[in-house]
Amino acid sequence: KGMPMHEQTHPPMGKYLIALGEILFGVTPLGWRFVCALLGVLLVPVFYWFLQLLTENAQVSLVGSALFCMDFMHLTLSRIATLDSLVAFFILLMAALFLKLLKMAAEEISCGRKGPSAKVLCLMLLDGAAVGMAVSTKWTGFYAMLGMALCFFGAVGVWCCRAKRKGTSCRYSILLLAEGIGVYSVIPFVIYLLSFVPVMKALGEKNLFQVMWKVSVFMLDFHSGITFE
């Protein structure tokens, strides 16, 4: 509506999601809390799925999810309009998708496939989108992405070492690595860049890259300059 933007200390995606609730229900307590509460609820089944992938034990996953439902931080942050529950949802989603990706890739390697299947690539694209949403909501997602990258390189390294010990080709792992570098570099960056399109229009600018860089530098300067007394 041409109103000045007073908050640029975080990437804009999370604020768009909160605004979506306000569009649906107005600028009311329900409107500004709706999306955060919704994703806070969806965190529970995603957490169950993550535990199921991690432990392959339904009872452990159920108990862990039940304990998560009673976590006071989760309950509190999901009831207010903050970015924390939003970025937590996307980080947990990207972790679950990544774990599913590793399991699927390991199964294909054990079956002797020469390269990643279309299912693996689609899963990687979805995971890349989750990474992009996390980073575009809050830079906390970037640190989670770095941790995931270390796990990805580590898994590929382990698979290559196993292939060499068995005297087989590590072609699958190399192709998966190449696809991963491409997907996890391009998809998150594109989503992060496109999240600044409304910001560019609000500022009356025409260069999207310049707007993204300017706001990102402002965010970095703001957070690096925070002091506590």
Tell me the role of every PLM-derived stretch:
Residues 1, 145, 152-229:
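Transmembrane-lumen/periplasm boundary regions of multi-pass, lipid-linked membrane glycan transferases
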Residues 5-17, 27-30, 229:
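Extracytoplasmic catalytic/substrate-binding loops of multi-pass membrane glycan-assembly enzymes
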Residues 32-39, 64, 83, 179-183:
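Alpha-helical transmembrane segments of multi-pass integral membrane proteins
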Residues 34-55, 93-97:
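Transmembrane-helix motifs of polytopic, lipid-linked glycan transferases
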Residues 36, 73-86, 137-140:
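Short acidic/glycine- and proline-prone juxtamembrane loop motifs at membrane-interface regions
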Residues 40-43, 68, 83, 87-95, ...:
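Hydrophobic core segments of transmembrane alpha-helices in multi-pass, intramembrane catalytic enzymes
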Residues 52-55, 94-124, 134, 153-163:
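Membrane-interface transmembrane helices that cradle and orient dolichyl/undecaprenyl
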Residues 64-69, 76, 96, 131, ...:
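Short helix- or helix-capping micro-motifs
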